[in-house]
Structure formats: C-alpha cells, structure tokens
Amino acid sequence: MGNSFGCSASGERLVSAARDGDFVEARMLLDCNPCLAKYSTFGGLNSPLHFAAAKGHNEIVGLLLENGADVNSRNYCGQTALMQACRYGHWEVVQTLLLFRCNVTRADYLSGRTALHFAAVNGHVRCLRLAVADFIPSAPFESVNTQTNGDSSNTKSKHEQSGLSKFVNKAADGGITALHMAALNGYYDCVQLLLDLHADVSTVTFHYGTSMDLIGAGSTPLHYAACGGNLKCCQILVARGASCLALNCNGWLPLDIARMCGRHWLEPLLSPNSDLTIPMFPPSNYLSLPLMSVLNIAREYGLLSSATNSDEAEICAVCLERACTLAAEDFEPTIPHRR
C-alpha cells in the first residue's frame, strides 16, 4: 500500500497532518508528492483520508481526494472514510465524500454495518439524510410518497425506491438494522427519518448471532425502543404500525422488555390493552432538502475544487456557494449554515 512508495516518513507526516487538521502541512506534502494521498499505515491500514474524515477536517478530506486518494478505501476493519465521518457526525465530510461519488452501500468486515448504521447508532441524522441523498428525488415529500404508494408505472422511480428500501433495511450482524440502533439509543429524529425512508417497522433480528442478549433474538425495533426507554421513539413506531403484541424468540413482548429494563413509564403505551391516544407524527423535515439536485450540480460543475483553500471563505452547507443565495430559515430544522 502506501509504504511501497518509499516515502514512509513523508507519509507519516501526512497522516499526522490529516489527523491534526494541519492543512498547510498537508498541502505542502502533497504538492511535493501527490502520491502520498494514497499512503496508508502498515498496522491499521488507515489512510490519511480515514484520519481526516474521523476528525472532521473537511478541507483536508477535499485536498486528499483531489490528489487521488481512493474515496472507497478500507481500513483493517473494512471501514471507509464515509463510515468514519458518519460515526462521528461530521456531515460536512459526508457531503464532500458524496461529491466524489463514494459508495454508500458498503458494509464493514467486523459487523456488517453500513454508513447508515454508524450514523444511526450515534444519532447523527444529518449524516443519515446525506447518505441517502442519491436515492431521494429532489421533490417535496408528499409528491415522492404519493408516487411511491400510488399506481404510477414510472420504472425509474420504482427502481430508486427499491434500492432505497434495500439500503435502509440492510441488516448488520445479528439482523440489526439502522432502525434498531436508532430506536435503542432513543434518537427520535433518526427513527422518524428512517421510517419515512420506508424502514421496515416489523423487521426482526436473527435467531442467531445477536449481540443484544438482554433483548433477545427475533426482536423488532419496538423491542429495542422499549429497552432504550425513549417514549417518543416508541410512540412513532406504534403510530407507524409496530405491534405491541410481537413476541421475540424468548417469548417476550415489548412490554416485558420495558419492565425488565426498568422503563416503567412505557407500560401504559406498550400494554396490549392500552387505550392511549397515539399522537400523529408529520414527515421528517429533513426530507425537504433537494439534496439529489444539489449534489448532481456540484459534481457536474466541480464546485468542491474552490473549497479547499483554507484562506478563503467557507462554502454554504445548503447551496454549496460562496455567497449563499438561500435563506437558512427556509430550511429549518435542516442542515444549518456553518459559522
């Protein structure tokens, strides 16, 4: 890999610069030897791109990619830079990686997690939304949803929705989906968005290989939400069709999980005989972003190339322009302007 270039000393300097966010040092090293962008450490096979993505150094990420770094390179765990950025919530980096057409559907070697799993487990809803940008047409949610549920014969749309469904419902080891993870950790925004993206509310973990022995195999996202204890997550799952009567392989209801985990405030909602009124939940506001159009325009016109100079003003996170022409308040609570 990288050490085959015979520049291990310079390569390690670039790794340090990428990790520490030293843009000047990174640019100097790459000006001298652009091949260093493909350098990787021996032990962990982590590239400078992995380090920069994990730390959120977006300008260095762009610099490395423009100098030939492989946007889909993996470390020893099989994780890509996109997974690292989603894991730590660096949505600006996710945006940059998408501009360079990273593969969002790849899964790591250790647990089979995709970028969606890494975003969902830590509640990074902006990263989650960006990761599905190429699957969602740039149209209002109501239009997209009507087209999906109606009698439209649009083959392209059906293909896009099929690809989106497969991606959103992709299971990691043990059958755990991104929805399971978001529900367990109580990230309502992620749960809401995943459900709007047609995540399967009734999907169950595998009967083998599950790492959540406390919850049990064959568990639904509602079982996981009951363990996590977030009332709002449980409410929206029930509102979207999750069954309070679903039994896992241990014969436990979501109510049983809630009791075992000490989540007694969930009992009135999860009781099979509950007569509580479930609130209505509107579609996620994050779906209103026309990200597919924005990304395609940026890719076509190469808007990223002007964003890697640290001495210039940063681009707007919404419209990808220097002088923003969009009103931030029109997109609340979506991706905000950087300050």
Tell me the role of every PLM-derived stretch:
Residues 25, 59-60, 92-93, 126-127, ...:
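Conserved ankyrin/ankyrin-like repeat signature
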Residues 30-35, 62-69, 96-103, 130-138, ...:
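Ankyrin repeat domain, specifically the short helix-to-loop turn at the C-terminus of the second helix
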Residues 9, 43-44, 76-77, 110-111, ...:
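Ankyrin repeat start-site detector
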Residues 1-13, 130-160, 170, 197, ...:
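Ankyrin-repeat-protein effector appendages
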